[in-house]
Amino acid sequence: MDFLCYLHAGWDPLVRPAESTRPWMDATPESFAYRCLPLNIANAHGWEILSPCDAEAYWTGQSGPEAVIVKNAPGTQKQNAAVSLFGQGTVTFHIQALFRTPPGWDLFITGSPNRPKDGIMPLSGVVETDWSPYSFTMNWKFTRRNHRIKFQRGEPICFVFPVQRGALERMDPKVVDLEENPALEADYKAWSKSRDEFQANIASARSPAERWQKRYYRGVGMADEHPVADHRTRLRLKPFVAGEPAAEAVPTMTFDEAGLARIIGAATAAAREGATAAELAVALARAGVPGGAAARLAAACGEDAEQTLPAPSSYGRGPG
């Protein structure tokens, strides 16, 4: 799938596949923090956008934009400068890129995972980058007043990764007693017992290897089997490279009679409840319409879903 980064004239974003390393993890004894595979995967689970300049900011504690005093390094170009734009103790970076994800995919925008910065924190957002022609900003919020922070050129200021729109809404969360899954319960109890024994003996371990159970890291179950074929111990994301503009893909929608009835029913129910276009899009996505198509169908109904819905045939009885 293409993940595109469109550049306007004069834009030159510093974007790279995220690093799995962190200075604080390097500093742990024997770098033991890297034995935590979930940390490693999260660290590299996207692309980092780096600060284009050196900047310093100070927050007086007031709510207005003037309460954040930002000083950029001499010679910093205007489009690269950190600014105080929104108030509320925030520092803003304009991201010089227009990302385009495949149909039905959003972009999760946040700070680099497991990379704390004293006195300030990254804010997170989700943008529908499969259709939006709008750029976005990356914002950091002070966590205490009368505090000075610095951003260095080349420091990660933004972290992005695509997420499939509607996937969360299609999840059916359920609480189930563990005893209803005897195999899982047996494996859990065996692991819990082995973990207790391991923790009791860890102080007498003679080597680093003896202080690491490593079952999850190796993707091995309690019967020494490999439950999944696509277990990963690292991510290998591709860098952005020069390429030809891709044509906007149009998702193919194929529904049987039951699926079509479900979609029309969801749209009708949403309209009766006075749903907004955004709420209608969610209802359509839950009914099985791909995210990008759901947004377009909802938009076709106008800002208020009580307006006339598209004819059933426009929902795609077959390919198209």
Feature locations, PLM:
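Generic short N-terminal amphipathic or hydrophobic helices
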Residues: 249, 262-263, 288
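Eukaryotic low-complexity, mixed-charge intrinsically disordered interaction/regulatory segments enriched
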Residues: 255-283
